[in-house]
């Protein structure tokens, strides 16, 4: 396990040495990984750092407003509305790897635009060890590892937490006195809801996934899962009132894990599962059914794509 104080001192010195007198931008998502990386980088280089939050249109319900409120103390924070550009980049793409690469490409282009504006030579990222293992082992690319384009307009990419597991990141976050809403936050994938809708990403699928994920996180908070999510799988026949409908199938997944490398599906009580399905089908008229995923990792991954 990492010793937080020693790690923080080491990484602050390392970031300062890597960046020198140059400027840097950091990809800020509001999750514990990027927030911890931002705190480390800010301690190291101060106003040379510009945090950038990109509203991709693929985020959780209320995410952008929460980012604005949580990080309003950072005067240099940039919030970029790139929703249309990301949907355009994903148009017609159904393959999971291609989706991740398209998202990685667009992320980098957004950061390059800001970097040119603030004359930044470095990109700081919150990449952690499981991201690298899955990308290097070709299990699946992460938008900030294997999903990066081959040509990147930065002098260097700085990844201070590339050797940490998620639980170690949380220890460092606590040592840095990050708010509990950040330090203890449930993992959310970099590509966002794009990998929680199977097949092509559309506004309709994203709307269903966003509302369903909100329900799942609310209802399962007391169970303290390592990660809980809802994914839009496809369509199936259902009945609403007296009418036959062809609506979306939503899969609910909740797992326990230490580091994300392996995970066990949580055993949830029937009443909770019924409450979740009732809310999802009741609040989304185009959802026909809800299922619960009982598969561990392995053989499954935690996310669907």
Swiss-Prot record:
What would be the name of the gene that encodes this protein?
A: guaAB
This protein's pathway reads:
Purine metabolism; GMP biosynthesis; GMP from XMP (L-Gln route): step 1/1
Report keywords, A-Z: ATP-binding, GMP biosynthesis, Ligase, Nucleotide-binding, Purine biosynthesis
Q: Where is the GMPS ATP-PPase domain?
A: 2-185
Cellular compartments per GO CC: cytosol
What is the reaction catalyzed? XMP + L-glutamine + ATP + H2O = GMP + L-glutamate + AMP + diphosphate + 2 H(+)
Briefly, what is this protein's role? Catalyzes the synthesis of GMP from XMP.
Question: Under which name does UniProt file this protein?
Answer: GMP synthase [glutamine-hydrolyzing] subunit B
Residues that, per the record, bind ATP: 29-35
Q: Which organism is it from?
A: Natronomonas pharaonis (strain ATCC 35678 / DSM 2160 / CIP 103997 / JCM 8858 / NBRC 14720 / NCIMB 2260 / Gabara) (Halobacterium pharaonis)
Subunit structure as annotated in this protein's UniProt entry: Heterodimer composed of a glutamine amidotransferase subunit (A) and a GMP-binding subunit (B).
The record, for SUPFAM superfamilies, names: Adenine nucleotide alpha hydrolases-like, GMP synthetase C-terminal dimerisation domain
Give the EC number.
6.3.5.2
